[in-house]
């Protein structure tokens, strides 16, 4: 069978396991910010390349897809509690593997010994934990890249999808849904047939949308609206599906579902 359409994000996720005190999904933005700070600081190439940093050398935002960071939470089963079990480094599709390895390998493993490197992540009241490359032969389901990239027609959000603007008026939900369809096109996926927005996720263990801090607009432009989403395509697509304005920072992460509206895993 021909391969299902994918997005600008590579489905070969690099998974980092988290150790330490429980970190819950609403800490996503804080956690990805701490990870990004760490990566930028210890990248062997300084200043870090555009695909890694998301910025050109002059400091302006890049126009090309770049490294995204996303939480991998314990969700989608009966006892799921939404805690973050790991983080994924999501590379842009088409990035040269040697180039990626040159920047990431020394961060993940000690260049002298080849042993895994553990890095602390800390943010005051939010979390205190450590991350390390996940290398177990049989990873827990939520740390298995397949769980997040499996081909599926229906996807449901685990972290809220940030809308590109605030919608008013009686048709605001239709217009907001259309904007999420456009956001899927924007990452190289086909335009979905249907998008349903709701403050509650379809997936067990995922917190209500209002429990997640809102993404702030750049230059003090206020808070951005967000909501959970169910996205239905005409044909199966391959993940990861990261959509909306927060997609490089862990918002808009969706999970493949089967046709019955149950978790695919």
Enumerate the language-model features and the residues they cover:
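RNA-interacting cores
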Residues: 1-265
């Amino acid at each position: 069978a021909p391969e299902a359409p994918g997005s600008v994000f590579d489905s070969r996720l690099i998974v980092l396991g988290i150790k330490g005190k429980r970190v819950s999904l609403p800490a996503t933005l804080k956690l990805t910010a701490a990870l990004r700070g760490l990566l930028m600081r210890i990248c062997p190439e300084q200043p870090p390349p555009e695909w890694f940093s998301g910025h050109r050398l002059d400091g302006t935002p890049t126009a090309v897809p770049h490294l995204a960071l996303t939480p991998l939470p314990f969700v989608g089963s009966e006892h799921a509690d939404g805690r973050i079990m790991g983080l994924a480094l999501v590379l842009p599709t088409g990035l040269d593997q040697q180039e990626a390895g040159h920047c990431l390998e020394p961060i993940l493993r000690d260049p002298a010994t080849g042993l895994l490197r553990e890095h602390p992540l800390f943010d005051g009241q939010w979390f205190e934990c450590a991350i390390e490359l996940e290398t177990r032969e049989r990873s827990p389901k939520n740390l298995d890249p397949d769980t997040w990239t499996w081909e599926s027609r229906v996807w449901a959000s685990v972290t809220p999808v940030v809308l590109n603007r605030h919608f008013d008026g009686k048709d605001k939900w239709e217009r907001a849904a259309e904007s999420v369809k456009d956001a899927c096109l924007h990452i190289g996926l086909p335009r979905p047939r249907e998008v349903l927005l709701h403050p509650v996720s379809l997936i067990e263990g995922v917190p209500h949308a209002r429990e997640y801090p809102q993404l702030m607009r750049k230059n003090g432009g206020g808070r951005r609206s967000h909501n959970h989403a169910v996205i239905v395509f005409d044909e199966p697509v391959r993940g990861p599906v990261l959509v909306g304005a927060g997609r490089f920072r862990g918002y808009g992460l969706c999970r493949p579902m089967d046709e019955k509206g149950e978790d695919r895993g």
